[in-house]
Amino acid sequence: MSAQESCLSLIKYFLFVFNLFFFVLGSLIFCFGIWILIDKTSFVSFVGLAFVPLQIWSKVLAISGIFTMGIALLGCVGALKELRCLLGLYFGMLLLLFATQITLGILISTQRAQLERSLRDVVEKTIQKYGTNPEETAAEESWDYVQFQLRCCGWHYPQDWFQVLILRGNGSEAHRVPCSCYNLSATNDSTILDKVILPQLSRLGHLARSRHSADICAVPAESHIYREGCAQGLQKWLHNNLISIVGICLGVGLLELGFMTLSIFLCRNLDHVYNRLARYR
């Protein structure tokens, strides 16, 4: 076996093994997405997180899993069977994915102000219509998750929620906000949250906790909710995690470039004379 044949054989099995790994990874991601769709309650208990945007995550995970499995399958079969058509299709899919990522990066950099305005409009619309439209459940769950994770409330400030009609309290009642705004560390009275949620849970029955955005908490004092708006919270999160985000994007891009280079190299250097059909006889 010549040095060139040894190199091609090494590249072939390298592509096969790594794409097999990504195929298994895609299968697991797809299974998690299906799990969420079938049994949301057990998934929430498993991950141990509150205010998880289940509807969005189930679709994202399922689609991502199918896409990952599809690309990995092309790489596995194309490399193992030395099929130029599959290797070329594998290269094209990776190139399209890489170009899409570059385009998104450029758009985010050049249209940042417009994206911020669009995001603000979407969030303000979600806040104003909170709890009034069953079709907006996914958006409400997502915003609850953002508030819970970033420890913030509202877009500009917590008072954004006080303008929502169904949450507004009268002179004798405390204001109400989504429970994702509630700051448990601000008070030692851990029963306040339960006093508000439990009556709702009793009415929901077996559907209790299936939609966390339905949880509304009374706030006896503004000190019991996060004081920072999520606009500032998002800016802080991006600033603190900028290096990690850039590192992950660069890592994914380099990985895609590496697989593209290996696949096109293998595709161009396969023996033109060898009859691929002979091995199937």
Curated annotation (Swiss-Prot):
Residues 1-17, 75-85, 267-281 are cytoplasmic. Keywords: Cell membrane, Glycoprotein, Membrane, Transmembrane, Transmembrane helix. Tyrosine phosphorylated; leading to activation of downstream signaling pathways. It is a multi-pass membrane protein. One of its GO terms (biological process) is regulation of defense response to virus. It holds the Pfam family Tetraspanin. Its main location: membrane. Residues 39-59, 112-241 are extracellular. It is found in: Cell membrane. InterPro entries: Tetraspanin/Peripherin, Tetraspanin_animals, Tetraspanin_CS, Tetraspanin_EC2_sf. B-lymphocytes. Antigen presenting cells. Glycans are attached at residues 170, 183, 188. The chain crosses the membrane at residues 18-38, 60-74, 86-111, 242-266. GO terms for cellular component: extracellular exosome; immunological synapse; membrane; plasma membrane. Structural component of specialized membrane microdomains known as tetraspanin-enriched microdomains (TERMs), which act as platforms for receptor clustering and signaling. Participates thereby in diverse biological functions such as cell signal transduction, adhesion, migration and protein trafficking. Upon ligand binding, two signaling pathways are activated, one acting through phosphorylation by LYN leading to cell death or a survival pathway with activation of GSK3B. Interacts with SCIMP. Interacts with SOCS3. Interacts with DECTIN1/CLEC7A. Belongs to the tetraspanin (TM4SF) family. This is Leukocyte antigen CD37. It comes from Homo sapiens.
